[in-house]
Amino acid sequence: MHKIEKKWQKIWQEEKAFQVSNESSKPKYYVLEMLPYPSGKIHIGHVRNYSIGDVIARFMTMQGFNVLHPMGWDAFGLPAENAAIKNNSRPQDWTYSNIEYMKKQLQSMGFAYDWTREINSCDPEYYKHEQKFFLELYDRNLVYQKESLVNWDPVDNTVLANEQVVDGRGWRSGAIIEKRYLKQWFLKITDYAEELLNEIQNLKDWPAAVRVMQEEWIGKSTGVNFHFKVKYHENTTIEVFSTKPETIFGASFIGIAFNHPIIEQLICKTPEIVNFITKCSYITRSSEIDKAEKEGIFSGLYVIHPFDANIFLPVIITNFVLMDYGTGAIFGCPAHDKRDHELAIKMNLPIKQVIETGNIQEGILINSDWLNGLTSSEAKQKVIEKFEKLGIGKRSVNYRLKDWSISRQRFWGCPIPMIHCKTCGVVPVPYKDLPVTLPDDVSFDSNYNPLEHHSSWKYVNCPKCDNSAIRETDTFDTFFESSWYFTRYCNSNAVEMTDKKACNYWLPVDKYIGGIEHAVMHLLYARFFTKLMNEHNYVSIREPFKGLFTQGMVLHATYKDENNNWLYPAEVVKKGNEFFHKENNTRVVQGRIEKMSKSKKNIIDLETIREQYSADAIRLFVLSDSPPEKDLEWSASGIEGCSRFINKLENMFEAIFSLKDDMKSEINKDLNRLIHLTIKHVADDIKTFSLNRAIARMRTLTNAIYYEISKDRIDVRTIKYGFNVLVQLLNPFIPHITEEIWQKLGNKERLYKSVFAEFDESILELSTYIMAVQVNGKLRDTYEFDVDISEDEVKQITVNLPKVQKFLAGKEPRNIILVPRKIVNIIV
């Protein structure tokens, strides 16, 4: 198989098989898998993702489409920098070496990529365009810098966006996140929150789960902002945001965020308060708040109820109010809010019911003075009107989504093209001086950004006044590069950021394939970037991905030795029902079956498996054992079965090729119908990404043809036709062996250039059908009827069948129950 695979990979390369033109009379189809980070090796999870995309690309090509199927590299990022620190090397050397190796791996798998469009995000020829675009956004006031409380990863020594903090820990390092105030660059994604939210409903070909995740992340809330006066400090107010102002008479406290400004202004920071604030600082996301136990501490302050000056509400510093949502303050109504209720129970605060049914949602107002008897919606309007009349509140819309923090305090990223001058302030780098590139001669002798200590790079003259100034030493968040790369594939050699004409032809991406873990960050940022690029005339679209498919993960068992160290599967051998270390024969503990990951070493080396089996066998296995959207458990027996199937195809070719045509033989209608049914269903299955079902159907056809070969009297013409069809249907899945067999079958045209097999609708129509014949509900016979027979004729024929007459014993049936084309039940 390896010789066959190398042969066809060479042919495809020489024939430029998968290069596509931007000029074509064919309809276009743009299929794209999320580009990989060049970490060193392609893993099986990648292979599954890329195999799914490759099936679609090859199938759509055979369907007559001009298919764009590119590949590139998301090449900036922390792993390269960490490797440089560890190995005393340069990040670019590590990155480019990995790209070279991983590209060879992808090519060895036979993926149909147009490599002429390859992009590399760490190439200055790529990132110079995003630097210019950043400056264009700055000119539109869509970029700003401010000091803000950020998520600081103490291991990676950089800031993380909220989306990059998982359960209070850094998404890569796993370190507990700290809160720090730093100057950061932001993009105003919140200016586009409403459009990003509204357009979700038009993403019909996206998984519902992803749409819901984006809706929840944007998190639109409609309510009111209003002010409470602080007791004894009546010139000072606390502004709260509420979506349920009608419950104001049930308020028993004010909850504020741990970093609310009033804490610095008026609150005496006792040791208990300081400790509580420190504890709260580890909670960075509302998803973590939902899981956390609700806690609070009395601040020492009270506020005055806006509608009753005799009611004073305690101000509680809480762990479930965030400063970056709403105003950083809420009023707590424990009777009608779960979180407020939990805190009230813990702190012994009053719980006053103000909705008659006690519902958290809606009902009739009680215990609410002038709101009594109103419905919740009526009361809400009346309260808001009162706030507005008193001048203490106004209607407001809030979003959970916050502006995108794009600054990272690391070296291996795209430099932010700004200069800091003591005289002129912040000055953009002139367009003519782009790209701002990274220096080659950096030292990684510490765990901090080496740009801070590189004097010849850091110190420059101000473009405005020519005085000494300092470059911005932060680099872009790597999601910046991956937010627009799909537009660059349309013409990766474009002089400008994009080739507008090429983008008009190819975009939007028809099918985007990747993991659901990117549902919020990457996909949201890419949607945002597309809207920005549209407004700058780089693209004509405002949504980048027409269709989205999220594949499941590849799983494998985990293993640990007696010292609790992770082991690779290749280091473990099974003896009976137990596991042992191959080298020292010590006992090994098998852990959970989990997503393949380097950290837990439960990964399969692609090169080892490919050498042992074949690229086609791997492709077939990752597509056949589970629906593509579900997780797939790696199985040695599974890939062995796929390898045997490929060998079976080769053996079938030898057997079929030697058969002599017999023009007098009767056409095998059943086999011919199965062939055409398989063509129809496989095409439908590929279109709906039911790839495992398509493979199952082709296995059924394979077995049917194999069975026919073994008969004494056979229809050679239909067998040969069916085998030709089978090879063609299998080609998008296992392209190497099918190209080889196709050629040996005497076909002149390359299989990748052929038109996908078409079915004949008339052959699918049955001329007869078989019915089960029952007497008193028990099967007594079967009978084959013509499709155009009437129900009365069916009843007449079945009653007179000898096996039925035996049970009738000369009597007339009491009733005949007919289920058309399935069952006739004669009641005696």
Curated annotation (Swiss-Prot):
GO cellular component: cytoplasm
Motif ('HIGH' region): 36-46
Motif extent ('KMSKS' region): 595-599
EC number: 6.1.1.4
GO molecular function: aminoacyl-tRNA deacylase activity; ATP binding; leucine-tRNA ligase activity
Keyword ATP-binding: yes
Reaction(s) this enzyme catalyzes, per UniProt: tRNA(Leu) + L-leucine + ATP = L-leucyl-tRNA(Leu) + AMP + diphosphate
Compartment annotation: Cytoplasm
Keyword Ligase: yes
Primary residence: cytoplasm
Binding site residues for ATP: K598
Listed GO biological process terms: leucyl-tRNA aminoacylation
Record keywords, A-Z: Aminoacyl-tRNA synthetase, ATP-binding, Cytoplasm, Ligase, Nucleotide-binding, Protein biosynthesis
CDD domains: Anticodon_Ia_Leu_BEm, LeuRS_core
Disulfide bond residue pairs: none
InterPro entries tied to this protein: aa-tRNA-synth_I_CS, aa-tRNA-synth_Ia, Leu-tRNA-ligase, Leu_tRNA-synth_edit, M/V/L/I-tRNA-synth_anticd-bd, Methionyl/Leucyl_tRNA_Synth, Rossmann-like_a/b/a_fold, tRNAsynth_Ia_anticodon-bd
Similarity comment: Belongs to the class-I aminoacyl-tRNA synthetase family.
UniProt protein name: Leucine--tRNA ligase
Native organism: Rickettsia prowazekii (strain Madrid E)
Name of the gene encoding the protein in the UniProt record: leuS
